[in-house]
């Protein structure tokens, strides 16, 4: 459960719950390992269709209107997928991933699965420039792994419903978006990745022109620290150039389960994404800084209870000041969290 509050002209407040349940099962089959992956959420009930307050997040449709400065709720089902992994030789293994709803090989690991954001309940502002394809309605991915190198290619459907709500959405579905990702394992603690994808023009939720997406990043995981530095850009076909984003986030974990987390972002927003079309320049440069702390207050077996909070401070250009009432709009939240077997419900 959380109490979230954003301030100034576009501020809002909410009592609600950010929550997710992830289930994974695996077993031997046909000389390899077959897996089932399911992830769901009840945020449409616990947050409502308008989601949670978050300044400068991408506007979306809900209840027949446009919602600004909120993050949309997660859909009922975010992943329903099967996988197959097999070792072909001492130096080569392969994988096949097929999903009715799932994540293609585009961008970094989605923020939900990064160690550097494990205790952070906030969706990055750069989400729509880096990893927003994580719940695509139709994905097929083939991967090959050598010591120190992973290569993956995906075909997927990038169309989304007009509003969050349908469990499945396949109107006009085609696997006509493509993506590839290369990941270098620099020792046991560092991963460096590069990614490219092409998505055709879509309507509905997350509507966009045909575009290319580029991404680069490095991830470090070694207790007590996890760190991610990520660059992502969308380059619409026919545009003057790409829109850029840079994210750096880190988390420190104490031996008792406490966590200190932080995130710094630079994002280029379009006027359309802020629902301010015609009144400001087409592209706006935004910076955001966040710091938070999560304290373990109870541990019983594999269940851990936490209390946490965070503060987010944003820096906006002068053209946005009349709409936000300040050049430094900010927000804060306090929350209680229950974690079960390494997964969390907030």
Regions found by a protein language model. Give the residues of each.
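Repeated loop/turn-to-beta-strand initiation elements of outer-membrane beta-barrel proteins
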Residues: 30-36, 90-94, 104, 144, ...
């Amino acid at each position: 459960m959380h109490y979230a509050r954003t301030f100034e002209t576009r501020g809002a407040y909410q009592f609600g719950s950010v929550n997710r349940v992830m289930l994974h099962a695996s077993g031997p089959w046909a000389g390899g390992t077959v897996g089932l992956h399911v992830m769901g959420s009840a945020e449409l009930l616990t947050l409502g269709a308008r989601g949670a307050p978050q300044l400068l997040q991408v506007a979306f449709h809900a209840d027949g209107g446009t919602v600004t400065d909120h993050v949309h709720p997660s859909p009922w089902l975010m992943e329903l997928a099967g996988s197959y992994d097999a070792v072909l030789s001492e130096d080569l293994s392969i994988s096949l991933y097929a999903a009715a709803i799932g994540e293609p090989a585009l961008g970094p690991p989605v923020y939900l699965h990064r160690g550097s954001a494990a205790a952070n309940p906030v969706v990055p502002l750069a989400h729509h420039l880096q990893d927003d394809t994580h719940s695509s309605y139709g994905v097929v991915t083939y991967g090959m792994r050598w010591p120190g190198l992973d290569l993956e290619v995906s075909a997927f459907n990038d169309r989304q419903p007009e509003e969050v709500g349908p469990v499945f959405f396949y109107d006009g579905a085609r696997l006509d978006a493509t993506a590839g990702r290369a990941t270098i394992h620099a020792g046991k603690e560092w991963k460096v990745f590069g990614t490219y994808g092409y998505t055709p023009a879509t309507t509905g939720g997350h509507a966009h022109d045909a575009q290319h997406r580029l991404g680069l990043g490095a991830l470090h995981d070694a207790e007590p620290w996890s760190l991610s530095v990520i660059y992502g850009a969308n380059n619409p076909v026919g545009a003057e150039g790409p829109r850029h984003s840079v994210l750096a986030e880190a988390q420190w974990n104490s031996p008792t389960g406490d966590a200190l987390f932080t995130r710094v972002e630079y994002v280029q927003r379009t006027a359309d994404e802020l629902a301010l079309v015609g009144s400001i320049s087409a592209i706006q440069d935004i910076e955001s800084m966040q710091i938070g702390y999560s304290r373990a207050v109870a541990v019983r077996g594999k269940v851990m209870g936490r209390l946490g909070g965070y503060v987010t401070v944003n820096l906006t250009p002068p053209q946005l000041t009349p709409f936000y009432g300040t050049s430094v709009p900010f927000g804060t939240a306090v929350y209680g969290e229950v974690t079960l077997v390494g997964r969390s419900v907030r």
